[in-house]
Amino acid sequence: MYNLHREKIFMSYNQNKQYLEDNPEIQEKIELYGLNLLNEVISDNEEEIRADYNEANFLHPFWMNYPPLDRGKMPKGDQIPWIEVGEKAVGSKLTRLVSQREDITVREIGLPTGPDERYLLTSPTIYSLTNGFTDSIMMFVDIKSVGPRDSDYDLVLSPNQVSGNGDWAQLEGGIQNNQQTIQGPRSSQIFLPTIPPLYILSDGTIAPVVHLFIKPIYAMRSLTKGDTGQSLYKIKLASVPNGLGLFCNPGYAFDSAYKFLFRPGKDDRTKSLLQKRVRVDLRVLDKIGPRVMTIDMDK
């Protein structure tokens, strides 16, 4: 099956990748579309999202003796890992809510690697925004839950949460991304993004990748209200540019105007290149354009 549609996909991929690289405004429009879409869906469903997120606290007797393992460094012990609460009560929920929009069709395309939520989104709005280039995007949505002791302006991204330049030179070879040198204030790191900038489906659908990150931020009520539990405080949304925008045209990752957009991650040197993460600074990201949004959920 690997080679059944390979040649036509190869031809279409290179032709359409070049078109996107030559016309970066198309990618920027669909990235803003994806960001605004999630913002609207969250705003329209605030009550449901907040209620289901906070329900985890009322269910305390059911998990208190077998809590999730803390993956942080030197935890104080008074903070419960809330990662999966955000993934289910926000991430999975948003996929369902997006699919219910009148002008949107969602397909859960089989991909063996990628972010928490990944699906093909088709809409006539995309067709209009891209001047008929495509009506579809590959939505890559990751949930990054944080509490009051975590940074709310950092995103820590794995290689499979970032797309690269996406060269496909030989039919048999498949797509390869260039390694990138990430320079931070005090150190540097080699980073290898592992996601292509676009997908071509077997039916000919052109699907540029749109990377969106949802950052549910919870409050530890023991610190703020003299209470117990961890309640949803706010949600940050971020749109990280596609690999073509980052590393090709306009090349945000290399532009001094966005210095330290990427910084070395928190993995030690023993980690494989395919596992080493990188940090994105949301304060720098927001300088590129309307790339970061915040929704107050503490109501």
From Swiss-Prot:
Keywords: Endonuclease, Hydrolase, Magnesium, Metal-binding, Nuclease, Restriction system. One of its GO terms (molecular function) is type II site-specific deoxyribonuclease activity. The keyword NADP does not apply. Its cofactor is Mg(2+). InterPro entries: Restrct_endonuc-II-like, Restrct_endonuc_II_BglI, Restrct_endonuc_II_BglI_sf. Its EC number is 3.1.21.4. Coiled coil: none annotated. Mg(2+) 1 binds at D116, D142, I143. Binds 2 magnesium ions per subunit. One of its GO terms (biological process) is DNA restriction-modification system. It catalyses: Endonucleolytic cleavage of DNA to give specific double-stranded fragments with terminal 5'-phosphates. It holds the Pfam family Endonuc_BglI. Homodimer. This is Type II restriction enzyme BglI. The lineage of its organism: Bacteria, Bacillati, Bacillota, Bacilli, Bacillales.
